[in-house]
């Protein structure tokens, strides 16, 4: 199966590594998603990469484990990531907490917490996002929204502005072609009959259901055809709570 994790490599050659964006969605109203974080990553190979994430505490961002790097800078308060505004806050990451069972080959347990060196200042442009409760098993059929700075089309350059797209939770059978899909710890999201999906650059962004973060964008088929796989946040609340409590 040709899986494609959704982070964005900026300096590699080849079409499979170009920047990406939400497909079939719309531009967010500026600063209507004040918890969104744009992650500027220097990889272990010294490439520049990018992901999405979201602020859950003044000093913690939640994202995907495959967005880990040698160093990460977090941009908060952004709508257009290329046009500086007074709302911007740029903060360095002090420590990256990858889930201890994360497997980069199977792309399971794809979740990471980032502790910031300084606490973010909560403003109209910067805020936190509530998480799904412990073991709150959200059922298939719910309509949710994915948010990120990924591609708007497979062959298009990355979006400068924050995008969002409506995506419906699917039965686990819809993701059976992903051999490592695990229903208890992952969500199968997106109608296979509609070209509305996350793509490169959206990794680590939230899946919002009734204003609550239920998932984290993880991977999709290389051709961008839905459904996509999101990490199921409720499954990891005990681990998240432990990291927050101890740090």
Curated annotation (Swiss-Prot):
Top enzyme category: hydrolase
Protein's cellular compartments: Secreted; Cytoplasmic granule
Main location as per UniProt: secreted
Reaction catalysed by this enzyme: Preferential cleavage: Phe-|-Xaa > Tyr-|-Xaa > Trp-|-Xaa > Leu-|-Xaa
Tissue expression from the record: Mast cells.
Top-level taxon: Eukaryota
Disulfide feature: 51-67, 144-209, 175-188
Domain Peptidase S1: 22-245
Signal peptide per UniProt: 1-19
Keywords annotated in UniProt: Disulfide bond, Glycoprotein, Hydrolase, Protease, Secreted, Serine protease, Signal, Zymogen
PROSITE patterns: TRYPSIN_DOM (PS50240), TRYPSIN_HIS (PS00134), TRYPSIN_SER (PS00135)
Keyword Cytoplasm included in the entry's annotation: no
Sample GO molecular function, one term: serine-type endopeptidase activity
EC number in record: 3.4.21.39
Propeptide residue intervals: 20-21
Single GO cellular component term: secretory granule
Glycan-modified residues: 80
Pfam families (UniProt xref): Trypsin
Location of the active site: 66, 110, 203
GO biological process annotation, one example: proteolysis
Similarity section: Belongs to the peptidase S1 family. Granzyme subfamily.
Alphabetized PANTHER family for the sequence: CHYMASE (PTHR24271:SF24), KALLIKREIN-RELATED (PTHR24271)
Chain's role: Major secreted protease of mast cells with suspected roles in vasoactive peptide generation, extracellular matrix degradation, and regulation of gland secretion.
The protein's name in its UniProt record: Chymase
Origin species: Mus musculus (Mouse)
